[in-house]
Amino acid sequence: MSLDTLNEFVQAIDAAGELVRVRQPVKAHLELCEIADRVMKQPGGGPALLFEHVILRDGTRSRFPVGINLFGSMSRMALSLGVEELDDHGDRITKLLDLKVPEGIMGKLSMLPRLMEVAKFPPRMQSGTPPCQEVVWRGDEVDLDQLPIITCWPEDGGPYITFPMVITKDPKRGIRNVGMYRVQQLGKNTLAMHWQRHKVGAAHWREMAERGERMPVVIAIGADPASMYSASAPLPPTVDEFIFAGFLRRKPVQLAKALTCDLEVPADADFVLEGYIDPAEALVTEGPFGDHTGFYSLADLYPAVHVTAVTMRRNPIFPATIVGRPPMEDFYLGHATERIFLPLLKLTIPEIVDYHMPAEGIFHNLVFVSIRKEYPGQAYKVMNAMWGQGLMSLAKVLVVVDDWVNVRNPQEAWWVALNNIDPERDTRFTMGPMDVLDHSSRAFTYGSKMGIDATKKLPEEGFTRDWPPVIEMDEATKRAVDAMWPSLGIPAR
């Protein structure tokens, strides 16, 4: 099922029995986030929340409800992308990557259905007034204080838009980028844009600054859930996130022209903030911010965005999220990326069977990888290859295990790893780029990494002892116990 709007997504969550409507007055300053944090820590991620009576900083009631933890469970994450299991999209990517031009006219004709599917992905421009421009604030009408922008943690530098889709365009090639960068509210019409140096939006800004030209920026808040997710996906700079969202939705994203700048926006967005960055202006202080590491990221200097227009639907929902000590909603977004992009990782490192980034590792700190080991030193080959893969280059600890290990179960992965390693023999250290949020690295964005080879050791690797087999019950006994289990009076596992 493809969902075209955020409201449709919320209705689908409600129909699935996973939405709690909070009708009691709750402050956008801290209270809303404390409630959300407690819910996100519940087993399975807790329900989605729709706060219908949000109190703004001036004590008045917001006209707009706030949705939070909308993506915060495995079932809701799958629902948002229109699949039963997140691996389903990975399977679709595998089939596309396996496209080989067959011999003969009939063979070529057999490819048409898959090629036609690809042709449906690019976004389409919508004619007429789009839903996202049913209400328009321009110039002096712009007042960000009227939006339920949340303050998450006590030491945060201010209120933050935490689920934005930041739209920019490459000034050289005209390629659009949609990124998810936190945005701090500084005033009624001013924001601070936190895009880290390695992000595509930051590269666009640097290019515009070198030219001395104002940079148009659009911030969409709320859209179809596939587009919202795609803004967080680690796509190459040349891939339009709206094309990827079209692939996930199985139909194109509808776009519309912004009113005050030369950019396109999701036609079905709930809110759109249009504006610009002036390269002649000094950078502004952004932060601190309670981040997904569970620690505050410190204040730093970033560009200011001047908002020239705010447009919205007539009855919009303001989506938000919070990050902090794991597990949080962002774990489920990251898990979707893990499942969807596995085929692309296998394309360049074919011996990989699976990989997993557990919640405690907050994505970049810990990665488990299972491989089909065929020759000595292969685990280290895989480590080096993964450290050369885009954002995987930021991984601090890589643990490589054999193909039979379920890396999606961290308890099993650690059990195998801690039994299989000789620390001196099986660990390797190297230096490389680190996440900008890593406060432990010896230098900003640069530090050490550790690789752990927890695979079964081969004689060629200098292991001369017998390697013990894993304990397993025989299949006949398991079948016999399965048959008698209902009569034993023991609760089902």
Predicted regions and their residues:
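Extended, highly charged
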Residues: M1-P288, H292-A304, T308-R493
